[in-house]
Amino acid sequence: MTTILPNLPTGQKVGIAFSGGLDTSAALLWMRQKGAVPYAYTANLGQPDEPDYDEIPRRAMQYGAEAARLVDCRAQLVAEGIAALQAGAFHISTAGLTYFNTTPIGRAVTGTMLVAAMKEDGVNIWGDGSTFKGNDIERFYRYGLLTNPDLKIYKPWLDQTFIDELGGRAEMSEYMRQAGFDYKMSAEKAYSTDSNMLGATHEAKDLELLNSGIRIVQPIMGVAFWQDSVQIKAEEVTVRFEEGQPVALNGVEYADPVELLLEANRIGGRHGLGMSDQIENRIIEAKSRGIYEAPGLALLFIAYERLVTGIHNEDTIEQYRENGRKLGRLLYQGRWFDPQAIMLRETAQRWVARAITGEVTLELRRGNDYSLLNTESANLTYAPERLSMEKVENAPFTPADRIGQLTMRNLDIVDTREKLFTYVKTGLLAPSAGSALPQIKDGKK
């Protein structure tokens, strides 16, 4: 079954995910002038660099849209972001700094909610601005077809006629000007930025070079903490969770998770918290590089993980982290609503997150520099008296108990020695006098 249309379907309704930028503006106008009936759909994702959402549909109508809709995706975006946080669905990290999968979460929400809106309007052909080299083309493809099985895909950037006529930004700008729209290209940055209220992604152009780094980036959700001229004061912050849901910051309760995340963004952003530089594997297995911002999610995740480690046992934490890495990869691949992802996500939400009730206090300084100051929860299994170095009444175990426990360890120690001796005999191990391995001469002794 062919779902991708190589040429413009003239005379038919075509929905386009419309950002208001030059690419989608030129594409919409071009589709109308070539005989299609374009419908424009704009997702309000709380992008920190978008000053006026209401203006975007108005521009789409000016460029020839049959209809233009602004779809408020903020509540769903935050709900999915918190679900990812609860499950630890983050598989990309470098030296302890995490990428919070903010773009994949945004695509899951956009890809389903915009296609659902199109379906309501009887629009069954969808186009967007993703290129054939990136992840988004596959994410949108999957989410679109999951939402509307009758969906057809038309992408101007896969249409050779469109490419021949409007192959670059200069050509698009001139095309708009000749059509009577004084569309001026914005000043070219040294990199590309994509954002939603969960986080921002900076990539491409100069950032494709590994000798260009974070110092060329102008943060849109925080501050350039690496610049000595930027003044940042240390700040104490408290974060409270109830049954896995963040509910309060600095003692102020938020009934609306969207408002809570916005405040978390403001707090974390004042310090540049949550910025990271990652080399990652795209869905097609080629490596790319991105610099990411996620101040609010980073703040919430620090507090959440602190409570996780204080409440759950070691095996639960290990399973949560293993499943989280698997789920993070599925999310990255555009499989957030696949059965295997739902299974992992709901397991974490039920058996890990529901126990996470408590409050964490931390001090934020510059960038990702912070200290944990206090952790409080009625569900803590951390009990310092169990291991206190001081004499305590009614100690949970005695020296005699520990002797018994150590004696039982002899069983596996003997087995381990025999295995090591077997490896020596087969030549797998040949410890020398300077080796840190035990000097095994007889597996029975």
Curated annotation (Swiss-Prot):
GO molecular function: argininosuccinate synthase activity; ATP binding; protein homodimerization activity
Chain residues that bind L-citrulline: 99, 135, 139, 192, 201, 203, 280
Signal peptide: none
Listed CDD domains: ASS (cd01999)
GO cellular component, one term: cytoplasm
Pfam families membership: Arginosuc_syn_C, Arginosuc_synth
Keywords attached to this entry: Amino-acid biosynthesis, Arginine biosynthesis, ATP-binding, Cytoplasm, Ligase, Nucleotide-binding
SS bond list: none
Reaction catalyzed: L-citrulline + L-aspartate + ATP = 2-(N(omega)-L-arginino)succinate + AMP + diphosphate + H(+)
Pathway: Amino-acid biosynthesis; L-arginine biosynthesis; L-arginine from L-ornithine and carbamoyl phosphate: step 2/3
Main subcellular localisation: cytoplasm
EC number(s) recorded for this UniProt protein: 6.3.4.5
GO biological process: argininosuccinate metabolic process; L-arginine biosynthetic process; urea cycle
Residues noted as binding ATP in the record, renumbered to the chain: 17-25, 43, 129, 131, 136, 194
Enzyme class per UniProt: ligase
Annotated family: Belongs to the argininosuccinate synthase family. Type 2 subfamily.
Subunit structure of this chain's protein: Homotetramer.
Protein name (Swiss-Prot/TrEMBL): Argininosuccinate synthase
High-level lineage: Bacteria, Pseudomonadati, Pseudomonadota, Betaproteobacteria, Burkholderiales
Annotated gene: argG
